[in-house]
């Protein structure tokens, strides 16, 4: 069998033949002990205080980076040190959102949320979020306006009902005094509580 014809039979490349890792390209790989030395710093960044607060180490905080992602964090720490950035600035650049993300939406627009805009907003939002409704000045004004409008409508309805009752009463009364002289009509209208009625009764 020809050794050149069988690529599977070729021995793997020796580890010594691999190119040497460039320490400047990957600082975490260049200093393996440094990642372990920075573990307390990583624990503090992640909100875990180590031995002082053991219970906090077991709580899952999705808004903080995972402690299991140490190589990425070690690289980030080295990059921060190179750029002279503070830990707060670095945490801010690492993630723009801190979970739980809450989007505040005015109650006056809650109808819009239920039927279109809020659903579209949540679907297009880059992270999981919840919408919290808040009292805005518009919604308080709208409630007062609605109450005033309801009161006005009730008053108008009451007035219309009274007018309808008056018309019904006037239409149902027979007019008895059609042939009364002008003098008596004048006298009757002077004492009559209803000026439209020509009857003295």
From Swiss-Prot:
Q: Looking at the keywords, is Nucleus present?
A: yes
Primary location: nucleus
Q: Where is the segment annotated Disordered?
A: 1-29, 136-201
Question: What is the tissue specificity?
Answer: Expressed in the anterior presomitic mesoderm and somites of stage E9.5 dpc embryos. Also expressed in tongue, diaphragm and intercostal muscles at 16.5 dpc.
Cite a GO CC annotation. Answer: nucleus
One Pfam family hit = Ripply
Q: Where is the segment annotated Ripply homology domain?
A: 99-134
Where does this chain carry the motif WRPW motif? Answer: 57-60
| Biased composition, class Low complexity, residue ranges | 15-29
Entry's localization field: Nucleus
Q: Name one GO biological process term.
A: somite rostral/caudal axis specification
Q: Which InterPro entries match?
A: Ripply_fam
Nucleus in keyword set: yes
Keywords in alphabetical order, please: Developmental protein, Nucleus, Repressor, Transcription, Transcription regulation
> Function of this protein?
Plays a role in somitogenesis. Essential for transcriptional repression of the segmental patterning genes, thus terminating the segmentation program in the presomitic mesoderm, and also required for the maintenance of rostrocaudal polarity in somites.
Q: How does the entry describe the domains?
A: The ripply homology domain is required for transcriptional repression.
Q: Which family does it belong to?
A: Belongs to the ripply family.
The protein's name is Protein ripply1
């Amino acid at each position: 069998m020809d050794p050149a014809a069988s690529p599977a039979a070729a021995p793997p490349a020796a580890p010594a033949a691999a190119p040497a890792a460039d320490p400047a390209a990957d600082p975490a790989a260049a200093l393996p002990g440094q990642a372990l030395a920075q573990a307390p710093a990583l624990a503090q960044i992640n909100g875990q205080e180590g031995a002082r607060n053991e219970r906090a180490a077991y709580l899952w905080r999705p808004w903080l980076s995972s402690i299991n992602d140490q190589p990425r964090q070690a690289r980030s720490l080295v990059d921060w040190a190179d750029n002279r950035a503070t830990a707060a600035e670095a945490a801010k650049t690492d993630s723009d959102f801190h979970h739980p993300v809450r989007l505040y939406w005015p109650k006056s627009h809650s109808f819009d949320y239920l039927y279109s805009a809020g659903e579209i907003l949540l679907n297009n939002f880059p992270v999981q979020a919840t919408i919290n409704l808040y009292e805005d000045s518009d919604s308080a004004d709208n409630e007062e306006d609605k109450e005033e409008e309801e009161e006005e409508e009730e008053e108008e309805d009451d007035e219309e009902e009274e007018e309808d009752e008056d018309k019904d009463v006037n239409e149902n009364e027979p007019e008895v005094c059609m042939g009364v002289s002008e003098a008596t009509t004048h006298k009757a209208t002077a004492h009559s509580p209803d000026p439209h009625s020509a009857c003295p009764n």
